[in-house]
């Protein structure tokens, strides 16, 4: 009791008083109000002196504590002492209570007068401290009195609200549950609607003192007296702290954290006169109490509340002690376990009940602002049941200033208007200065296949669950869900384990579960290890969950024995702060595990209720919205999109407090499910309407209690602001505004306004986009509201409620479910069988913990490149994730899959980790601990496939060349043997991550090349390839999950697969073409085992696709390398569109057939299938001229195994496309000509190096060049590039390129490459979709350096067909089965499927693209396949139509294209297709009747027929519309000279896809299905074109048309495509005349439209989709009619049967009568 300083409470009171001086009238009014309340509740407790008008009460300013004795309340403390449960260490409260009873309200004045009279000197400190303590304790007493007053019976906690969040689990008798009455106002806390749930967070802690002061702040001083004082006199505070009124105001506003005897400014520096006094001693001196009081105390004092925090702060200030962190060797199970802090648990233990009732949710925004004086703060409006705590609301929050036409900036709320994405701290193009997008949130990010930071939860992912785990992050990710809560259920429940409960003196009630399990460590062949799984729970909401290897625990017992270690030693090591002595073994009752499940899973809820308010034009207020009696058509349309209307009466699923028995809450409501969640919407217009009640309480009682509310605005509605809403429960508003309602162009804008303490949540709203009405938008919105609800539960209000509930559960367990047994120290586990007598002994190893499956944690400092700052973080590395949690915000700021880590550069105290495409994370250890970095590197070696980087200084040769090619991804595609680069150690497949200290991830390909060309000294940091020569790639590159996954509706038909947004820019790769490409399908390097995804990977792995034409620039400036585009993972939903390769792990972009489209396939799950697919897809027969190139490498191997016959090198195929535009220059860089035959050579069959694999596919545009003199590849001579309208991306044009024949060597590579490329190019076309017809040929140009010459011919082949059409055939690995519906459903229209590139979901039967495996691969097999496909039975897939349709055989096509081209011969020589081609089955594209050019004739290719397809089986085919797979694949052609050249073309992009290949056959002209809805004029044009087949141009045109038709058929053809097709018709010469040098122009022509192409395509697709939907509707109607007829027929049949029976009976009777009559007569 010796603290000589003024108490915090005094200062607080004074500060408030100062604020009040300005407005005496208001003060009096308020005081009267409070006095009345006070008297009402406490009977005689409040003396008349409470009236502020009585100046005598002031105590004359100088009065001391003796100033008057207040009447003691007879029903006050004394009457209720018996109610206060005794609690140890509680003496202080009683002391205060007694003090309170002995003094009057005037004691408040005494405090003021003491200070006013200058009693601040040392001499007066003792009494002053006494006053302080009395004062504080008195306050507690008041709080207790209120809580335990007779009003307690009104405790409304159980009826507080209809919300699911109600704390009904809390025992009403709980001493902490004292919120029945608000101590500040004396009013019952139960409120109406929204306010019902505001939790009055006022407990028995010292905070009540300040709350009381606010309630009676003026009563104790006489305004006349105080008015005469100058503020300086009035506040003679220590000048070091608050020498001015400003400081006083700060104190009153709570900006100083107050603890008696201490001051913290901003929680930082210790301020106070007794700072010199040891922190602990100060606290100790203040807590002296008598034992009597201690026994009667109900709660610990304020000082004890802060005791631990104070110690902590002292430690930080004086000794720099780090915050608590778990043992390094403990492997955390999930993110929240890493955030577990036992210090916080101790610090908050006594403050669980110390919660002030504050205004929350929308009510905080709508509160009436109060004039602010010098020391002012917010006051609650009179009559409010909530007291606005000035400390909680220091300055009125002004909001974030973000407004638009949907939502206005609002105090206490934060708005999301678009463009807000996940925080990015790594160095990548997105946050580099050169990033042009300027948007932190792109389409891709909103549909990212990556787990968002807030979506990361469980870090320990079992090997067998990894593919499934990855599947879960597809599409929109559910965030802020503690999935780790299932830890106990998964690892303890139903298994032998031990539970211990107890009440720790520092931590309060605790519960520990521990289990010893045997863990097989695949890395340790010599034996198994034991693992201890631990779950440690305190009153904090975070739980310590994880495991520790037995070898990592120091113990007196031997490790690895059957007996195990003493549990006591394990617990003492893991949680040294826990008092083991307090623990008792849990009772052997089935209730114990059940209670623990409830406790752990308390925060999990998969049922949410969402309010929907309807805002008409001109409206904005709550009342107006509630009073809209009925819904308008726009709102009805929106509701129909969002969910299904259900009849409430008898409804058995989640009803969200709606009446399902008597219809008292309306007859119908809106219900839906999303993922694992059930959502019931409280729709304002479906709830009961009361004409005489403007407040519409029947509606508001539901919607006002919903945490998340959707505000639907019609056009013309005023911007929404939470200020207009009165509810403490509504924390998040999702505003949806409709545009063009009830039209075909209906679309929606979305905005969000969330309470400031609700953390941000996804999916992010892309900037400047509107969402077309689609399933994608529905999923986006549902994910948004689910995440909003989950995030809101992290706000202070709900956390406080959950914490109280949790504490009650724990207390119950510790008191009622324990035995007397303590923690066993004998190390005997009853569940360990004695049978295993052999004592496995695993010696304790150093760094044993680094082999743990869970997340090992280190304290690091990370560089935030987004904000150019260093942040302290916790680094966690598990077997699945690497993540960073910022210490200050406790938020995950970075996460990536361990499979995405490709390498690292480690220093003594820092490490730079590279992941995915070379993005980099820079970390340094805290306190320069080099041991941490060593451990981190070791851990990375164990859990990732990366390696240490190598720095090289490269020299130039005499020509200034560096001697290698690099593609757009930074992967070395070719190295000149024995050149300087080769001697320095650079090898094919190496990945450049830094060039001259600049991160490659931040550079475009052009910038990369410029750096390499212009730097005098070229220093590069490279990541070496895998042992098999394949480049290191992130799993997300190889197995990118499609941005938009196919979503199947309930009927199994895919919902529209369309981009969810409407935007002018192309959706595909939005910001950075280069990047996307990367992800694109580069094959997975590395061994199959590499990733779980592996199989997929492997496929992908097959090729390193060269950037393949990544070089080429689309008109919009983006580079669309086919491969990139097609497979780039980032292509947004549509981005990869057909390509989707992105999807596949295979990641092999171009060639790999693998690219499974199916998102599913992407996941490993598909892997096996994919592999099969690939294998199947591979053209076994195809002869890869050389050993199969690495492209396939892994798959190739498979394929080869399957079809040993593959002779042509797959890489060729893959190259084809690339080469076309590969930069000729690239060759320059190489300078060596070796590359020319590198194809065969480098990619020898065994060679993983397949250029494709390597990514050799050169970036088109010579990007491959080391940058030396690469010139962007342009089409060389253009043979007559075919512009496929659809851009069938006729790769074949590539063939033309060859025609160039300019480089024979090129040709060599090309043929195969061309093919593969093409197919894949078309896939790419998706990228092309952006409008560039995409010179596919560029792709081919990639030819590994050899092509460097970039034979012009290759370029020409660019057939600009927009790649988009996408070759993306997808073959599902499923292999035997047809993709569902692929074949059968016309709807898919392969075109559509292919096109889904754009992200459409197919509306009808098309199988989900995800399934399709890679069809793209064709390009890989591409040429072969294509050719073979052509040959293959066109009809294989089954549609005669498609057969008919199929395109010319490749040979013919080639001949037509370049009848005399020597290249052809060369190509042929290379492929020697016929001979080599084995009759493997070609991939069939499933023929849908619609596909126009499905394969035409088997042609000589029959042999190739055995393309993968067949192997794959129809189901593999993703899109059935096209001809059989084989058609999909580039057909193989005989080496016939002309044919050979064609080989690489990929024919049409999706539309024609395989058809294209078939198209070659001049004999048959494909006829589209009449139902296809083709434009006959186009058909006629096509026919004419056919007639002119002999001319290459015509042929090109024809192909064009065909592809165009195909697209149309697919009905996915975009408008631009159509237009393009028309243009082509108009100017056939257009496609052919492109100048060889105009490769770019070539692209551009088609491409010029590219900027708008995507939008056009999207619109077109939407139109098509609508048509399909209309057709579907009609079909359904017809079906209904037919069903009705059937019903009638059944009824007629029954009637006839009845009549027949009746007639029979009558006949029988007649017969009987007749015979009986005769008998009688007889």
From Swiss-Prot:
Gene3D superfamilies, per database record: 2.30.42.10, 6.10.140.210, Rap/Ran-GAP
Protein name, per record: Signal-induced proliferation-associated 1-like protein 2
Gene Ontology cellular-component terms listed: glutamatergic synapse
The UniProt record lists the keyword Coiled coil: yes
Biased composition (Gly residues): 57-66
Biased amino acid composition, Low complexity: 1091-1103, 1120-1131, 1220-1237, 1331-1355
Modified residues (Phosphoserine): 149, 380, 384, 1030, 1245, 1461, 1472, 1478, 1488, 1549, 1552, 1591
Domain (Rap-GAP) ranges: 596-813
GO biological process terms held by the UniProt record: presynaptic signal transduction; regulation of small GTPase mediated signal transduction
Regions annotated as coiled coil: 1652-1712
InterPro entries recorded: PDZ, PDZ_sf, Rap/Ran-GAP_sf, Rap/Ran_GAP_dom, Rap1_Ran_GAP, SIPA1L_C
Species, as recorded: Mus musculus (Mouse)
Keyword Iron applies: no
Pfam family, one: Rap_GAP
Gene Ontology molecular functions: GTPase activator activity
Domain PDZ: 951-1027
Composition bias type Basic and acidic residues, residue spans: 384-403, 1195-1218
Region (Disordered): 1-29, 44-72, 362-405, 1068-1246, 1331-1360
Keyword set, alphabetical order: Coiled coil, GTPase activation, Phosphoprotein
């Amino acid at each position: 009791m010796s603290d000589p300083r003024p108490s915090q409470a005094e200062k607080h009171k004074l500060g408030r008083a100062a604020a009040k001086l300005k407005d005496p009238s208001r003060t009096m009014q308020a005081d009267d109000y409070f006095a009345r309340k006070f008297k009402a509740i406490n009977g005689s407790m409040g003396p008349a002196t409470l009236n502020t008008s009585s100046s005598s009460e002031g105590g004359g300013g100088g009065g001391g504590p003796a100033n008057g004795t207040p009447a003691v309340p007879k029903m006050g403390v004394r009457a209720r002492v018996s109610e206060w449960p005794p609690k140890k260490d509680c003496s202080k409260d009683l002391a205060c209570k007694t003090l309170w009873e002995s003094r009057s309200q005037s004691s408040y004045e005494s405090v003021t007068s003491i200070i006013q009279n200058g009693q601040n000197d040392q001499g007066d400190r003792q009494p002053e401290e006494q006053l302080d303590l009395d004062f504080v304790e008195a306050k507690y007493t008041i709080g207790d009195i209120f809580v335990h007053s007779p009003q307690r019976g009104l405790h409304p906690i159980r009826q507080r609200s209809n919300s699911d969040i109600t704390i009904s689990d809390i025992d009403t008798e709980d001493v902490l549950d004292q919120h029945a009455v608000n101590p500040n106002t004396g009013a019952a806390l139960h409120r109406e609607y929204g306010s019902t749930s505001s939790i009055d967070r006022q407990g028995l802690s010292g905070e009540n003192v300040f709350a009381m002061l606010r309630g009676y702040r003026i009563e104790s001083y006489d305004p006349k007296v105080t008015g005469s004082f100058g503020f300086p006199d009035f506040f003679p505070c220590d000048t070091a702290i608050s020498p001015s009124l400003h400081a006083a105001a700060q104190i009153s506003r709570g900006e100083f954290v107050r603890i008696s005897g201490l001051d913290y400014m901003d929680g930082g520096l210790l301020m106070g006169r007794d700072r010199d006094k040891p922190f602990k001693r100060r606290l100790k001196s203040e807590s002296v109490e008598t034992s009597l009081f201690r026994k009667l105390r109900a709660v610990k004092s304020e000082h004890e509340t802060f005791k631990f925090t104070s110690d902590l702060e002292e430690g930080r200030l004086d000794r720099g002690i780090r915050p608590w962190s778990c043992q390094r060797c403990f492997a955390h199970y999930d993110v929240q376990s890493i955030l577990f802090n036992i210090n916080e648990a101790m610090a908050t233990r006594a403050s669980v009940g110390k919660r002030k009732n504050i205004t929350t949710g929308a009510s905080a925004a709508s509160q009436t602002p109060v004039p602010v004086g010098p020391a002012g703060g917010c006051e609650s409006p009179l009559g409010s049941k909530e007291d606005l705590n000035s400390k909680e609301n220091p300055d009125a929050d002004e909001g974030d200033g973000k407004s638009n036409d949907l939502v206005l900036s609002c105090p206490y709320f934060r708005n999301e208007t678009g463009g807000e994405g996940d925080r990015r701290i790594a160095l990548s193009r997105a946050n580099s200065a050169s990033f042009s997008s300027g948007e932190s949130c792109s389409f891709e990010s909103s549909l990212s296949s990556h787990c968002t930071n807030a979506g990361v939860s469980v870090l320990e992912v079992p090997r067998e669950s990894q593919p499934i785990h990855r599947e879960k992050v597809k599409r929109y990710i559910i965030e802020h869900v503690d999935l780790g809560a299932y830890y106990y259920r998964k690892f303890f429940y139903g298994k032998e384990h031990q539970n211990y409960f107890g009440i720790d003196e520092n931590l309060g009630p605790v519960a520990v579960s521990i289990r010893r399990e045997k863990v097989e460590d695949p890395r340790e062949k010599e034996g198994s290890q034991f693992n201890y799984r631990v779950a440690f729970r305190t009153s904090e909401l975070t739980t310590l969950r994880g495991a520790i290897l037995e070898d990592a625990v120091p113990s007196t017992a031997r490790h690895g024995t059957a007996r195990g270690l003493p549990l006591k030693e394990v617990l003492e090591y893991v949680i040294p702060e826990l008092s083991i002595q307090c623990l008792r073994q849990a009772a052997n009752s089935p209730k114990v595990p059940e209670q623990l499940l409830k406790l752990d899973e308390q925060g999990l809820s998969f049922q949410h209720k969402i309010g929907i308010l309807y805002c008409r034009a001109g409206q904005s207020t709550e009342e107006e919205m509630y009073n809209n009696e009925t819904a308008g058509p726009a709102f009805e349309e929106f509701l129909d999109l969002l969910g299904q209307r259900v009849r409430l009466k008898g409804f058995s699923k989640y009803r969200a407090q709606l009446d399902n028995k008597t219809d008292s809450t309306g007859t119908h409501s809106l219900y839906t499910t999303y993922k694992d969640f059930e959502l019931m919407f409280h729709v304002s217009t479906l709830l009961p309407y009361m004409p005489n009640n403007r407040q519409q309480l029947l509606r508001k009682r539901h919607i006002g209690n919903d945490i998340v509310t959707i505000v639907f605005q019609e056009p013309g509605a005023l911007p929404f602001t939470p200020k207009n809403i009165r509810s403490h429960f509504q924390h998040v508003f999702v505003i949806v505004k409709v545009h063009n309602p009830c039209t075909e162009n209906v679309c929606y804008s979305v905005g969000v306004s969330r309470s400031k303490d609700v953390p941000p949540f996804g999916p992010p709203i892309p900037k400047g986009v509107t969402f077309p009405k689609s399933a994608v938008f529905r999923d986006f919105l549902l994910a948004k509201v689910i995440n909003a609800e989950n995030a809101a539960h992290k706000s202070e209000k709900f956390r406080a409620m959950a914490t109280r509930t949790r504490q009650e559960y724990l207390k119950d367990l510790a008191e009622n479910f324990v035995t007397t047994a303590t923690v066993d120290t004998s190390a005997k586990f009853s569940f360990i069988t004695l049978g295993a007598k052999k004592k496995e002994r695993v010696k304790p190893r150093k760094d044993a913990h680094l082999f743990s499956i869970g997340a090992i944690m280190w304290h690091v400092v990370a560089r935030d490149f987004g904000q150019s700052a260093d942040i302290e973080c916790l680094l966690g590395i598990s077997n699945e994730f690497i993540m960073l949690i910022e210490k200050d915000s406790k938020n995950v700021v970075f996460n990536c899959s361990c499979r995405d880590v490709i390498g690292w550069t480690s220093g003594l105290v820092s490490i730079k980790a590279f992941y995915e495409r070379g993005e980099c994370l820079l970390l340094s250890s805290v306190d320069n601990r080099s041991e941490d970095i060593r451990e981190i590197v070791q851990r990375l070696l164990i859990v990732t496939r990366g390696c240490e980087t190598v720095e090289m200084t490269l020299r130039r040769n005499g020509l200034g060349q560096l001697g290698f090619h690099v593609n757009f991804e930074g992967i070395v595609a070719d190295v000149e043997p024995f050149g300087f680069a080769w001697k320095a150690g650079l090898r094919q497949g190496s990945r450049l991550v830094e060039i001259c200290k600049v991160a490659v991830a931040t550079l475009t390909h052009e910038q990369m090349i410029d750096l390499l060309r212009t730097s005098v000294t070229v220093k590069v940091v490279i990541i070496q390839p895998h042992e098999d020569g394949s480049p290191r790639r992130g799993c997300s590159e190889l197995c990118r999950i499609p941005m938009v996954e196919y979503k199947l509706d309930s009927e199994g038909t895919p919902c529209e697969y369309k981009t969810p947004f409407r935007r002018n820019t192309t959706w595909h790769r939005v910001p950075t073409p280069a990047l996307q490409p990367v992800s694109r399908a580069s094959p997975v390097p590395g061994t199959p085992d590499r990733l779980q995804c592996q199989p997929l990977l492997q496929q992908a792995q097959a090729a390193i696709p060269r950037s393949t034409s990544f070089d080429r620039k689309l008109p919009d400036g983006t580079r669309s390398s086919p491969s990139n585009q097609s497979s780039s993972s980032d292509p947004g939903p549509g981005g990869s569109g057909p390509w989707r390769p992105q999807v596949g792990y295979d990641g092999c972009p171009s060639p790999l057939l693998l690219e499974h489209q199916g998102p599913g396939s992407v996941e490993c799950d598909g892997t096996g299938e994919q592999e099969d697919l690939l294998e199947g897809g591979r053209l076994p027969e195809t002869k890869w001229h050389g050993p199969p190139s690495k492209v396939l490498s892994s798959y190739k191997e498979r394929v080869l195994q399957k079809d040993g016959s593959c002779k042509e090198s797959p890489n060729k195929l893959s190259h084809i496309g690339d080469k076309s535009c590969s930069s000729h220059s690239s060759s320059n860089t190489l300078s060596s000509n070796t590359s020319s035959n590198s194809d065969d050579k480098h990619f020898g069959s065994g060679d993983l190096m397949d250029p494709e694999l390597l990514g050799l596919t050169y970036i088109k545009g010579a990007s491959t060049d080391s940058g030396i003199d690469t010139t962007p590849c342009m089409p060389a001579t253009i043979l007559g590039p075919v512009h496929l309208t659809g851009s069938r991306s006729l790769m074949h044009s590539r063939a033309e390129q060859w025609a160039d024949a300019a480089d024979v060597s090129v040709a060599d590579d090309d043929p195969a490459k061309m093919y593969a490329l093409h197919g894949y190019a078309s896939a790419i076309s998706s990228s092309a979709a952006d409008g560039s017809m995409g010179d596919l040929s560029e792709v081919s140009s990639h030819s590994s350096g050899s092509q460097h010459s970039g034979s012009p011919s290759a370029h020409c082949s660019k057939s600009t067909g927009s790649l988009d059409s996408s070759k993306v055939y997808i073959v599902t690995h499923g292999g035997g089965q047809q993709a569902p519906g692929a074949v059968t459903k016309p709807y898919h229209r392969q075109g559509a499927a292919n096109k889904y590139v754009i992200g459409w979901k197919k509306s009808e039967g098309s199988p989900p693209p995800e399934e399709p495996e890679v069809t793209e691969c064709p390009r890989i097999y591409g040429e072969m396949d294509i050719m073979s496909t052509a040959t293959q039975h066109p009809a294989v897939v089954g549609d005669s139509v498609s057969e008919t349709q199929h395109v010319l055989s490749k040979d013919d096509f080639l001949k037509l294209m370049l009848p005399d081209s020597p290249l052809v011969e060369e190509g042929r020589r290379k492929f020697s297709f016929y001979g080599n081609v084995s009759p493997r089955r070609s991939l069939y594209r499933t023929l849908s009747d619609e596909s126009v050019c499905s394969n035409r004739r088997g042609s000589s290719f029959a042999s190739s027929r055995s393309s993968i397809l067949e192997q794959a089986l129809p189901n593999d085919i993703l899109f059935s519309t096209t001809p059989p797979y084989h058609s999909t694949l580039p057909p193989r052609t005989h080496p016939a000279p002309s044919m050979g050249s064609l080989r690489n073309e990929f024919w049409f992009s999706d539309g024609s896809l395989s058809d294209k290949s078939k198209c070659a056959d001049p004999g048959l002209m494909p006829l589209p299905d009449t139902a296809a809805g083709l434009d006959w004029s186009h058909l006629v044009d096509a026919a004419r074109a056919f007639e002119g087949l002999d001319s290459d141009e015509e042929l090109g045109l024809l192909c064009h048309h065909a592809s165009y038709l195909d697209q149309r058929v697919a009905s996915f053809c975009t408008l631009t495509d159509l237009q393009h097709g028309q243009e082509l018709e108009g100017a056939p010469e257009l496609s052919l005349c492109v100048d060889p040098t105009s490769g770019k122009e070539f692209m551009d022509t088609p491409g010029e439209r590219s900027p708008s192409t995507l939008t056009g395509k999207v619109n077109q697709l939407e139109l098509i989709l609508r048509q399909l939907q209309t057709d579907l509707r009609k079909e359904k109607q017809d079906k209904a009619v037919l069903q009705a007829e059937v019903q009638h027929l059944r009824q007629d049949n029954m009637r006839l049967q009845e009549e027949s029976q009746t007639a029979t009976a009558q006949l029988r009777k007649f017969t009987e009568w007749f015979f009986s009559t005769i008998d009688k007569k007889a």
